[in-house]
């Protein structure tokens, strides 16, 4: 059996176009994340001092921010990180990483988001670090959220809502989520920095983010969920 040459030509042409589109998409996304990372640097640069402690979130946009922050590391004291991944990147840049227990104040917390509503309510936790992110955000004087414009939404809920759970409670929590109208999906082969599991919740009504954040966190076995309604950012910077 021999495939006609013309068929092969159109197949490879189609594959080439598809790969070019993917390449251009990721190039544009990278440019957007670099753009908003620079905006965050511009926002905090003149407010930095040798006593300043930054809070650093987790995720691809934050990674770009850390890269940009490298040039300013002598202008501030150090950082409290929300994940082991971010801590590692900060140390690679020779930025001192502190435990939250060892600092009196965090001046600015910089982090991304999976969704941002018009009221600055967030969904976070795509990287599974939302529990520590929420803790560090709550300890900061000012929360600066940095996102590309695709993350701005009219209503939260298109992105699955991450819920961190104690491993032994995963099934019982999932049943409670079903009773609330959600569709729980166990995030396989993933363990949080705290040694817990993640349930990603689809199809749940988040029209009242504050109420749902409380409701989910009151389920026995839930550590925290990815709604940031009570710890929402004071500032949201969006890519051009």
What residue ranges belong to the model's regions?
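Conserved phosphate- and dinucleotide-binding cores of soluble alpha/beta proteins
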Residues: 31-34, 46, 84-240
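Short helix-loop-beta connector
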Residues: 44-52
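Active-site histidine-anchored catalytic micro-motif
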Residues: 67-75, 83-92
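Short active-site oxyanion
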Residues: 51-54, 72-79, 121
